[in-house]
Amino acid sequence: CTSVCPVKIPSADVALQLRAFLDEEGAGGHPLKSKVLNWLVRDPAHRIPQAVKAAALGQRMQNRIIGVVPQAIKKRLYNPLFSGKGPEPGYRNLYEALHLERGNIFVPRSGDGAPVQENTALKEAVLYFPGCGGSLLSRTIGLSALGLLLRTGVAVILPEAHLCCGYPLLSSGADAQFASNMARNKKALQATIAGATKRGFRVTHIVTACGSCREGIERLEPSTLLGEGGGQLVHLDVMQ
């Protein structure tokens, strides 16, 4: 999107800076928000999936309750949370659906249906970063992205554990927590790429499927993930 400001003020960056300033001054919103974010960011690989499962159960219960509320009462409820049924996040996430504890590298099948063997014909691979949307909130996004990538004929590597891009932290003004999460992500992605390299794959691209993850990965500077002399890691959206 082009800038709407005639004097080219980066409105989005200014908004994030103002958000961080308000948070530093103790005016960033309800104190519970900060406590929840601080709790999640200390162990995002385990706590964010747990929180999404709890949210899925809560939404499922709310939808059942809303279903028996008389229409006359619903019309009085202006809050969309209570005026009708809401979308239910998937309870089973991408990591559970794919059983990533068994392996995080997926290779396309050859023309005769036999899997392509590692360290032979297939060398090029892409690193897919599903984020929270494609792995926790709607695993069908992640599964669809994985299927599309495999159809291009390249191997697909996923992080072994859940990684959050951290952009919700940035947009909430939690700059310090965002920086900490970004450093953790960088270390995990470098280890993932190194593990794939040892198994004979050459990672050439990092792929995202959501706008906030796109921004979070760009701030991570993908070119630094391969290390010195490792080449250039190209960042693309999955539909590109």
Regions found by a protein language model. Give the residues of each.
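Short, flexible loop segments at boundaries between secondary-structure elements
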Residues: 225-240
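Iron-sulfur-cluster electron-transfer modules
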Residues: 1-164, 168-225
